[in-house]
Amino acid sequence: MRRVFTALCLSLAGCGTLLAQQPYADRWVWIFGWGLNREEDVVQIIPLLETAAKHGYNGAVLSANLDALCKQTPEYFRRLEQVKQACERLKLELIPSIFSVGYGGGALWHDPNLAEGLPVKDALFEVHGSEARHVPDPPVSIVNGGFEEFEGNRMKAFAFHDEPGVVSFPDTQVFHSGRASLRFENFRAQSAGNARVMQEVRVHPYRCYRMSVWVKTENLQPPQNLRLLVLAGNRDLAPRSFNVPATADWRKLTLTFNSMANDRVLVYVGLWGGQSGRFWVDDWTLEEVGAINVLRRPGTPVTVTSEDGSVVYAEGKDYAPLTDPGFSFWNMDRPAPTLRLLPGSRIRDGQRLRVSWYHPAVIYESQVTVCMGEPALYEIYEHEAKLLWERLKFQKVILNMDEVRMGGTCKACTGKDMAKLLGECVTKQVQILRKINPRVQVYIWSDMFDPHHNAHADYYLVQGDFTGSWNYIPKDTVIAVWGGEPREKSLLHFAQRGFRTLIACYYDAPNLDAVKGWQALAKQTKGVTGFMYTTWERKYDLLGAFGDLLWGR
């Protein structure tokens, strides 16, 4: 806190002197974690609204699939109406939270093919009778992935495993198959608490790979830090996480990744920042796979050619449309679809083909990003905005345009300026809303427009640079600057460019110490419209105290 106060006069000098205390126009609570698909949701939400009203709040931001209304049931709308009526009774403005690109939102309910696509280029297929099947080219594997070959405490073929004989051990008593596994324990024997095994593998650029491993845990802490990792340079090609219990019998973890322009990758399985407990790994595999979750939309075309590329075959004449009947973002452990030949096809039995397509990626446990360059996305937004207006005569809206972790990889957006594309996306969203209500005030999460947060190059799987994105969004957009610890540089960034800001803070802390830091910054920053109590873990115990601190009742 002392650092915050000593930096205030210097870092915020461009925003003017200490501002006189004025009542904040926006005194909001973030209502998150309820989808209105159960009666209990309303029962749990309304007491929060009542607490907010008692402590001087004037708005409730609701995140409850409000951009997928055409998919909802009558029961959903009845519950939404109950929440709306409660807000009216308590004099709280109900503010919808909609239109997520980073997390897909309602757009994926309409069409999962709108997911951003990663390119597979010229994968090998061989024709057998009336179908062509994918063939690994070249075959890849994890050498000694069964952990059967070792000398003493050292496993063969791996670049390293942490602290053999201290943290990592061959285990011939506990294994998934064969006669051994690799066990990790005593994580704090090294300061970082890491317990990993790594191997370098040669891959083919722009191919899709499936990696799996079997893991067993015993009193593992923290279990969420157990993961698979694929590194190419400084980029993580598979930023995936798994919900693994602290204690569990053998279970299989599987992910897919695209090699992109790389011909070698470093693959890891292990724990980062381990504290206690132990875990085992076994039967670690890696393989190139075919068109699992092939995306079909204008920006993700499928191309089939002869092996030398001299002949391009026609979909609908030479082969049936390549689709995946088992399409699922969550199930990768299944066979890839084959390419079916049609009667009269120019493709012959025994022929080798080169096939190109696009596939999605899941980030962490469940994040799937949609493509901002696909026109159909905005048709869905327009349709859903009209339905939302029928239910809620919204005067304010917050756009869920945070953490856009993919982009610039499918044909609809490859080569585009990602900062400009993001800004154009937001501008179209605002235009859609203002067609319906010309006076609507639009708010937006800050991170993708903040160079001190996520508005930069080399962001997750994005091919491109978000630097300068703030130059392409409407200037009357209110920026919801979010986070736990105060960030004066972020507030200054937006204030200097004439944006008003809403401070979305708290972030599930055990106390309001960080909120007090944000409060101090707000008093010295022009254009702060107010605060939003923001929790992602349904921690509302400090809701009343938050309001009392900031606007006092």
Model-derived regions, located:
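Extracellular and organelle-lumenal recognition/adhesion modules and their flexible linkers in secreted
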Residues: 129-343, 348
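Short, hydrophobic/aromatic-enriched beta-strand segments in well-ordered soluble domains
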Residues: 255, 351-359
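Glycoside hydrolase catalytic-domain groove-lining segments
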Residues: 453-517
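Bacterial N-terminal signal peptides
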Residues: 6-16
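Aromatic-lined carbohydrate-binding surfaces of glycoside hydrolases
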Residues: 25-139, 145, 356-473, 477
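Positively charged n-region of N-terminal signal peptides that target proteins for export
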Residues: 1-4
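Boundary at the C-terminal end of the N-terminal hydrophobic targeting segment
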Residues: 18-20
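Substrate-binding cleft of secreted/luminal carbohydrate-active enzymes
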Residues: 505-553
